[in-house]
Amino acid sequence: MSAVLTAEQALKLVGEMFVYHMPFNRALGMELERYEKEFAQLAFKNQPMMVGNWAQSILHGGVIASALDVAAGLVCVGSTLTRHETISEDELRQRLSRMGTIDLRVDYLRPGRGERFTATSSLLRAGNKVAVARVELHNEEQLYIASATATYMVG
């Protein structure tokens, strides 16, 4: 029998799993700065392996999309798994294993120039089966780099 988690503990565990336990996300160096049921903010620093255009030294579009996807996933999954006051860790992990991205629509608004990037997401809607989030990516100068709408299977 697994531990019973409060909604707050469940949200903390989801954040740790998404950002610090997934090898790809760790490789990107993501840091979770703020995480609530319907809002998430994560940041990462530009690294040589993230450059998609070496002549301009800008982020690869896949890195941008990945950061947006993770930020959106946090609010879609977190809001779903914390609807009740408590959840067992086993149930959380089992339900999480069935959740995933259905669609991610990215608008690349500016070249990904900068040293540090911040992705912020907010929940638009959470149903029993599907959740939708809106995400933005800014650099350290607060230039708007990209936005996305993400749809997740959550039930």
Curated annotation (Swiss-Prot):
GO molecular function: acyl-CoA hydrolase activity
Outcome of substituting residue 53 to A: Loss of activity
Inducing or repressing factors: Induced by acidic environment, high oxygen availability and exposure to aminoglycosides.
Compartments reported by the entry: Cytoplasm
UniProt EC number: 3.1.2.20
Disruption phenotype: The yigI-tesB-fadM triple knockout mutant shows severely limited, but not completely halted, growth on CLA.
InterPro entries from the UniProt entry: HotDog_dom_sf (IPR029069), PAAI_dom (IPR003736), Thioestr_dom (IPR006683)
CDD domains per the UniProt record, alphabetical: PaaI_thioesterase
GO cellular component terms attached to this protein's record: cytosol
Pfam families named among the record's database cross-references: 4HBT
Predominant cellular place of this UniProt entry's protein: cytoplasm
UniProt keyword Hydrolase present: yes
Single GO BP term: lipid metabolic process
Record keywords: Cytoplasm, Hydrolase, Lipid metabolism
Family: Belongs to the YigI thioesterase family.
Role description: Displays thioesterase activity against medium- to long-chain acyl-CoA substrates. Is involved in the thioesterase-dependent beta-oxidation pathway of (9Z,11E)-octadecadienoate (conjugated linoleic acid or CLA), along with TesB and FadM. In vitro, is active against decanoyl-CoA and palmitoyl-CoA (hexadecanoyl-CoA), but not with acetyl-, butyl- or benzoyl-CoA. Lacks general lipase or amidase activity. Likely plays an important and specific role under natural conditions in permitting the metabolism of unusual carbon sources.
Name of the protein in question: Medium/long-chain acyl-CoA thioesterase YigI
Species annotation: Escherichia coli (strain K12)
